[in-house]
């Protein structure tokens, strides 16, 4: 899996430039020639659209304007990648809902698997044209990590505009030292993350480390490297790392639990009492309506939501899971016994609000 940010593809005067993309394409070609399958997650559609209508939208404009630029630029982005390869390049656009909904998540995995079987090169981007602001994935670093787990990748390579992770931001601190090997993403390591230094993309070093943590939970190592350096990219094409290696977690969680932990969450939560919290955390139980005290948001049956403990100290997140009932229904059956559900609602989807198989503790 290769993730390429817009700062590596955007030309100084607007639009897309093949300057750095060529070297990255050679890295891709070297891996394909070695018999490896590869998927690209590529930003750059908005930057490409801005060149088509250079005075239309400024950086930081409302989302509808950025969506229009993404629609204009997506074809240009795919054309940029296609020019480097003889094999077909497949455009795959994903949204928050595609990864939050389990059935659509599995369908995306099947589609990507078939594209790879057919010898195509999938190029993935967030579908900025239709994503609404509150449901945007936010950055392609995290998208790349989730997709890396989805396709069961061996490694995630993140091309950036600096040489990897440093002990401090090298642009502002001359004493910053590069970190070649990161065995574990500790709080101290996360504190070293600085900004991207670019107004083109949305992901800084912090998001790259968050992505590495997501990939690591699936047993996938992450490599951060300077995509602007031809020497570094050529070394990578020869399997010689020049950058930062971030090790995978020692314990790989099961695929479904990974999805439950890392899929985008709906803007909502189920609120539970201390008894329910103890049953979930200590006994591995399912969540029953008797332990529910309320619901926040307007989620639907089948949505991924947070499960939060509400007590005298406030609220804190305990778990995530797939709700068997909508927020409206949960407010009606809260504090009720499971056998009362059908009498209250007129129907029942089962005795559990969230089944233990659809729940992961945080």
UniProtKB/Swiss-Prot annotation:
Q: Under which pathway is this protein filed?
A: Amino-acid biosynthesis; L-proline biosynthesis; L-glutamate 5-semialdehyde from L-glutamate: step 1/2
Alphabetically ordered keywords of this record: Amino-acid biosynthesis, ATP-binding, Cytoplasm, Kinase, Nucleotide-binding, Proline biosynthesis, Transferase
Q: Which domain of life is it from?
A: Bacteria
Entry's PROSITE patterns?
GLUTAMATE_5_KINASE, PUA
Summarize where ATP binds, as residue positions: 3, 160-161, 202-208
Instruction: Quote the Gene3D superfamilies the UniProt record gives.
Output: Acetylglutamate kinase-like, PUA domain
Q: Name one GO cellular component term.
A: cytosol
Q: Which Pfam families match?
A: AA_kinase (PF00696), PUA (PF01472)
Which class of enzymes does this protein belong to? transferase
The reaction(s) catalysed by this protein are: L-glutamate + ATP = L-glutamyl 5-phosphate + ADP
Principal localisation: cytoplasm
Family (UniProt): Belongs to the glutamate 5-kinase family.
* Annotated protein name in UniProt: Glutamate 5-kinase
Q: What gene is this protein translated from?
A: proB
